[in-house]
Amino acid sequence: SKEKVELEKIDALYEQYNSTKDEVQRKAIYKKIDSVSGVAAKYAIANEYDKMMSAMGAQGTNAFTSFEQTVYTDDIPSASLDKYLAVQAERFRNPVLRIFHTELEAVYEEKNRTLDNDGRKVSETLFSNLFQKHNYGLQTTIGTVEHLKNPSLIEIRKYFNKYYVPNNMGIILSGDFNPDEVIAKVDKAFSYMQPKPFDKYTFQPEDAITAPIVKEIIGPDAENLTIGYRLPGNKDKDALLADLVGQILTNGRAGLLDLNLVKKQKLLRASAFTYSLIDYGILYLSAAPTSGQSLEDVKALVLNEIENLKKGNFDDQLIT
């Protein structure tokens, strides 16, 4: 098709862009990408997917990527399920990356926001220190500025062909439908997909943490403290215990941090939760001082509640 010719030109231009170091030349190539994208756009319907979803009454169309998953979501009327499955089956058959460069600009904006976000900087620092051998800490989901500056549509397609296979994907549906009928429809719509081998992620076990790792983040937000404990992965029985620990420490009403620190106004805020992933997890504690307190004061108060937890100094109803 005429569009395919232009899209292939864009692929080639991105490869040229990636291999070019001179900034003046890179700007000239990117200008060509913009120009060819404009030509390619004449052969397609703008916002085609959103329009199709809206036409069938869909809401909440979105997608996100986290450590171990990329998820595509829609909320659709049950009467539109057949149409929806037909669209999704074609969508994942051979993705056409029509507006890649404009979407990339949106990701750039998101990345720039994270560079000035204290909470994000704290989280990334915590992960990078707890996980010095695992990708949880060796890289971020959004990537580096250099990654975003040098995209490759060819590599993206290689990734898609390698990992978007039925033995590495799941279709999750909930709502008003007959599950037996819907499973048969899903099987039929996606029957063209064939399982393929793919490389599962491997890693070296993390070394034991034998002493506290202390890092300081400088930023515009008010002072606050974050403490992280590395946990086993979500298939380990201790992961369930860790989740229970998080609930005992804080549940918004009667956890140790809630009762002893927040309600007694010893701290401005304090919370704990478990971040559970496949290979490892984190018990994540966060607290903010009241007026006149130092972060050392905050740490002492939080760690004291950890000691109360160890000693069983809490209401039994928290675990019944």
Label for each model-derived stretch:
Residues 148-152:
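Short, charged, amphipathic alpha-helices and their helix-cap/turn boundaries
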Residues 1-2, 227, 237-249, 257-259:
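Active/ligand-binding-proximal structured segments within catalytic/core domains
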Residues 33, 96-112, 178, 198-211, ...:
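Acidic/histidine-enriched alpha-helical segments
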Residues 95-98, 115-116, 132-137, 141, ...:
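An aromatic/glycine/proline-enriched structural segment found at the starts
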Residues 1-90, 121-146, 168-174, 223-233, ...:
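M16 family metallopeptidases and their MPP-like homologs
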